Amino acid sequence: MGSLADDPRNHLLNRNVRLFLGAAALLSGSLFGSYAILLNLFLLRLGYGTAFIGLANGAGLICWAIASPIAGARANRIGYRRLMLIGLSGVVGGSTLMPFGAAFEGTTRGVWLVVSHAITFTGAGVFFVNMQPFMMGTVIPKLRSRVFSLSSATFPTAGFAGSLIGGFLPGLFA
């Protein structure tokens, strides 16, 4: 049996923390950076006005708000890590479905776009509500404020980088 010093939770950047921060950076850079910009440009290109764009974005956010307390209530039964992976799957699945909406016409297209965005943000809600409790279990109490600080700094930094990338992408592919 190893000593207390061998416990990975005694290390600030242990494997779980590194994996979490990497996933958080990818999610923040893509979802809050590139995806946010490209989604609105995509909807404009499809001919939708600001009212529909507001509806689509609002539907995603309300689904996030609904999913968060439900996921939080289920965390003890299902587990933080598993729920975070389920949430990431929702983000990937919903954002992957979004572009296929361009193949439809009329109401079907609008419903597809709103529902796929809602799936994306439902997944985000499930992920984000479980991330801090997950992080609490990855390090000892005296390191938690440092890990939370790193986590908090990761989101806007990655979102900023993703926004820059998202702003350049249309020019590269137009």
Where are these regions (language model features)?
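Residue-level signature of mid-helix packing/kink "hotspots" within the transmembrane helices
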Residues: 61-69, 159-160
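Cytoplasmic helix-loop-helix junction between adjacent transmembrane helices
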Residues: 116-155
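Transmembrane alpha-helix termini and helix-breaking/packing motifs in multi-pass membrane transporters
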Residues: 161-174
